Amino acid sequence: MESANASTSATTIDQLCKTFNLSMHTLQINCVFCKNALTTAEIYSYAYKQLKVLFRGGYPYAACACCLEFHGKINQYRHFDYAGYATTVEEETKQDILDVLIRCYLCHKPLCEVEKVKHILTKARFIKLNCTWKGRCLHCWTTCMEDMLP
């Protein structure tokens, strides 16, 4: 894959595929952390989560699901600022909570309205990591709750 054109224009999986006239199913891309090739499911998931493609040494990289979760947990421990309810997020950002881009702190998916409302209804806090508000998506919320059950 010739990288000069891609590194300047492609920032997402979709753009990378368009630049090189590939389908996501045929795209081969490695994880920036562990260097393993992402599975087709991980590539689709990465695109769905609207995560950016990184360029290292002129080549595009993404992150596999395992490394995304691992680095999400590391980020939680290293860069935790504080936690706050939806009202805190709104006061700080001066935006309605539904308009604020909040990602899941484990899988990095942008939270939808339902997930943000669940935080509000259950009085769950959002957390601020490295100056960015994070929460839990429904998938990771369920996974976290399963770990707490006997």
Swiss-Prot record:
Belongs to the low risk human alphapapillomavirus family. The cancer-causing human papillomavirus E6 protein has a unique carboxy terminal PDZ domain containing substrate but low risk E6s do not possess this domain. Plays a major role in the induction and maintenance of cellular transformation. E6 associates with host UBE3A/E6-AP ubiquitin-protein ligase and modulates its activity. Sequesters tumor suppressor TP53 in the host cytoplasm and modulates its activity by interacting with host EP300 that results in the reduction of TP53 acetylation and activation. In turn, apoptosis induced by DNA damage is inhibited. E6 also protects host keratinocytes from apoptosis by mediating the degradation of host BAK1. May also inhibit host immune response. It is found in: Host cytoplasm; Host nucleus. Pfam families: E6 (PF00518). HAMAP family: HPV_E6 (MF_04006). Keywords: Activator, DNA-binding, Early protein, Host cytoplasm, Host nucleus, Host-virus interaction, Inhibition of host innate immune response by virus, Metal-binding, Modulation of host cell apoptosis by virus, Transcription, Transcription regulation, Viral immunoevasion, Zinc, Zinc-finger. GO terms for cellular component: host cell cytoplasm; host cell nucleus. A zinc finger (unnamed) spans 31-67, 104-140. GO terms for biological process: DNA-templated transcription; regulation of DNA-templated transcription; symbiont-mediated perturbation of host apoptosis; symbiont-mediated perturbation of host ubiquitin-like protein modification; symbiont-mediated suppression of host innate immune response; symbiont-mediated suppression of host type I interferon-mediated signaling pathway. Belongs to the papillomaviridae E6 protein family. One of its GO terms (molecular function) is DNA binding. Its main location: host cell. Forms homodimers. Interacts with ubiquitin-protein ligase UBE3A/E6-AP; this interaction stimulates UBE3A ubiquitin activity. Interacts with host TP53 and EP300; this interaction inhibits TP53 activity. Interacts with human ZYX. It comes from the Viruses. This is Protein E6. Gene3D superfamilies: E6 early regulatory protein.
